[in-house]
Amino acid sequence: MSGDYKPNYQSSPSRKRLPLQSKDQASIYKYQTPSTLNLYNNTVNNNSSNNSNNHLLHNSNPNSSYLYDSSKQYSNQINIRNNSNSNSNTNNITSKKASSSYSINNKVDHNSHNNNDDDDIEDDVDINYSTNNASSNILHNRFSNSNKDDSYIDYSTDENPKILKQPQPLYNHLNNQIQQQQQQQQQQQQQQQQQQQQQQQQQQQQQQQQQQQRNNNNNSNSSNNNNTSTTIKRNNQQIDNNSNKNIISKFIGDPWKNFYYGSNKSLWPFERNNNSNNSSNNNNKVNFKQAIWIFIFSVLFIGCLLGLFSTNFYGIHIYFPSFSTTKTNSPFNSTNNNIQFSNLITKEQLYPIIDEYFKKNEILKSYNKLFEKIENDIKYLSEREQYKDIINEIKEELKLVKLSNMDEDRVNQLISKMINHYNNNENNKQELKELLSKSIEELTKLKSDSKEQLIQISTESMNQLGQLKSESINQLGQVKSESIDKFQSTLKSLSKEEQSKIEREFNHQFNQLNKDADQLLSQHSLKIEKLREEINENQQSSLLKLTQEYKQLEERLKEFSSKLQQSISSSSMDQFESWKLVFIKDIEERINKESSKLTNQYIQLTQQFTKIQSFIKDNPSIDSLTNTIESLEGIKLLIEDILEVYSADKIAKVDYALGLAGASIEYNALHYRVSETYPPIKGSGSGSGSGGANGNSLGLYYYNLATNWIFPQPKPNPPETILDPMVNTGSCWGFYTGNGTIVIRLAKKIAITEVTMEHISSNISHHIDSAPKEFQVFGLINSSDIGQSLGVFTYDTTINRHLQTFKVNKIQSTTTTTTNQDQNDDDNIQEFSHVALRILSNHGYRYTCIYRFRVHGYQIPHPEQEQIQIIQEEQSFKQEEINQQQIEQIEQIEQIEKQQQSDEL
């Protein structure tokens, strides 16, 4: 017995073995002869009273067969021990070697108990009693601590086994364990029942509260609707409660009980040992087991909660796995269980029954469309406060109707209840089909009732909605008709008044223009005659004046000299002569200056006269004034010819491209780039005339900045010069070659009618070849617009007009729509905020100069925007006043504080 013990049981075929696998007994096999088996049968009958509790448990729970078998094994083992004790008086042979070997084996680690497997009981091959057997260690630890002698049975010979000493208190200990387990099970069942009752009470309270709220809101509904809704709710509650009970019984039922109590070993680590002499090491190991089990149960509890949340509070999904083919980690597939789940009804067998139900259930889908239509009508009417009460009632009725519909989840719950109680037998299948047919009939009845209720509710709601729609349509029609009549009347009155006013103003302005034209013609004709007379008279009068003034001066000198001679005495003659010489020199200088001025004026007058004569010769129309005055066009040309000589900026049209009015150059246009300025500054990027440092000539740039105050360099005119009203020789914007572009942001958004290109006159300019020849104008809605062409124009230098105006193509707007047929076409012209000028060619010079570019047009009135601007200006003015008041208050407070400080000092 010192090593591994291997009995030769093949020589004794009449022997039978009995496994002893309790937690308080060694895992060895005790072989018995037929004589001992008779004793075993007698003791079983005698000790039937000890197994009464197990029979009660078996009868109370039909699925507790494993618990019953385990208790039966315990009782059989106890009876065998009692019989062996009766024979111990005759065979009191002890084996010290066996006890010593078991004491040596008890030094093995106690933690190997968890890895012990006793599934090889039925094998008839060699059986090894190794020193690492955990159950033998546990047995020896428990019996070694007791004061009583231990007894074992020796099977080393083929004869009857030798009976050793056995522990007498083992029977009591096993009974205590069974009672404790039963008590724990009863307590757990009671706790579960209490929890279920509490949950049911809470659900009932919540449902009662919901019913009270619904009843308060649905007092106006009919009694039939209330009765149907309450019956549907009760049925739904019963279905939910039954499904919850079946699910709980499914997951806490027989498989788990069999898992814990089906085997002879007890895996529960929280049992208390009555032996007071256990060592501290065993207590520590038990505490470690408890911690592990607590961790496992906490993880399982958290997983269950997550599963419930993942199902969106609709309950646990019912699955129908085929346990015969697949293996999962669920407790139903554990090896310790002997239940065969392949006998259950599969999902495939229930498909035809369920399909019949869902085919009938497709009828309700058509009612969902009606619900959607009704909800849309409710949303349309919910915007008005008049129909709030009716809309709330309709919403509540729809909720009740929707609750009455059966879902697939509820059908699955009903099927799961039936499957939990029936196996794969033919009789049970027929019973299950009968139950399903009954349930389907009940469902069809419920559907028919719900259909009738739905039809009634839908007809009532549709009638109410139709009435509401008709009322609202009538009200809207009345309001719209009244507003349309008012609008038409106001339009007629306004149109008549405006037409009369416009006609009056037009006639008045036309008459005034005719009068002004006549006055201008008469005035200009008189001015021309006066100019001719003045020119002739000025030539003669200027010469006469000069001679007369010279003579007068000489006479004055003579008189003055005579007077001086008389007044001066003989003593001061020398001084007088010196003074006389000085005075004469001063007078001569003054005379020379005045004479030079007069000669210059005379020369200028002669030059002007010659120019006028040459102009008259070049224009024969001026000679025949009598013929040209008869037509207005001739008069206008005559006036323009005369004004061209003296001035050049008198077109009397608003320029929206004027820089002083708010126009500017747009450098950030998306599709147009401003050309580079000519000439560029050395050591600087010419860009747009602003002069920025270039990467290659950075040193020259800083050198020029440092020496600019000593050696000033000429700067080119920027592109903004074309927006300046002052036009002088050289004050132009130039760019290289004859092709260039520039974008102008107008002062205001206008409808463009005309464009004016201005250059200095050929009589003044050094070279007229730098003037632009052909150019194109684009109208832009904003800086990122491609633009629309307003026309291509040519600036003619052969005509004696340095300021030339061109009419622009009219572009219709795409946004505005004309509703009135009498509306003018000018009101539908597109407005532009930017203008792009593209020079196509010049008159042959290496660069091109633009002196001034003008844009003419008119603003289209927008009364809404004007009102917004007025409101914004008023608000800003009020805010400024408030700010000024606050500033004054702060200043007053500061002054008061300063006075107080000065008084304190």
UniProtKB/Swiss-Prot annotation:
**SUPFAM superfamilies, per database record:** beta-sandwich domain of Sec23/24 (SSF81995)
What Gene3D superfamilies does the record point to? Galactose-binding domain-like (2.60.120.260)
Q: Where is this region: Disordered?
A: 1-21, 41-166, 207-242
Show the ranges annotated as biased composition (Basic and acidic residues): 107-116
GO terms for MF: chromatin binding; DNA binding; identical protein binding; protein-membrane adaptor activity
The record's Gene Ontology cellular component field reads: nuclear envelope; nuclear inner membrane; nuclear outer membrane; nucleoplasm
Q: Which residues lie on this side of the membrane: Perinuclear space?
A: 312-905
Q: Which compartments is it annotated to reside in?
A: Nucleus membrane
Q: Where is the composition biased (Low complexity)?
A: 41-67, 75-101, 207-227
The residues forming a coiled coil are 170-221, 359-456, 504-609, 864-901
Q: Where does the record place Acidic residues bias? A: 117-126
Stated membrane topology is: Single-pass membrane protein
Boundaries of every SUN domain copy: 662-860
Q: What does this protein do?
A: May have an important role in defining the spacing of the nuclear envelope lumen. Essential for centrosome attachment to the nucleus, maintenance of correct ploidy, proper mitosis, association of the centromere cluster with the centrosome and the maintenance of genome stability. Requires direct chromatin binding for inner nuclear membrane targeting.
- Subunit-level organization: Homodimer and homooligomer.
> What is the official name of this protein in its record?
Sun domain-containing protein 1
The record lists the organism as: Dictyostelium discoideum (Social amoeba)
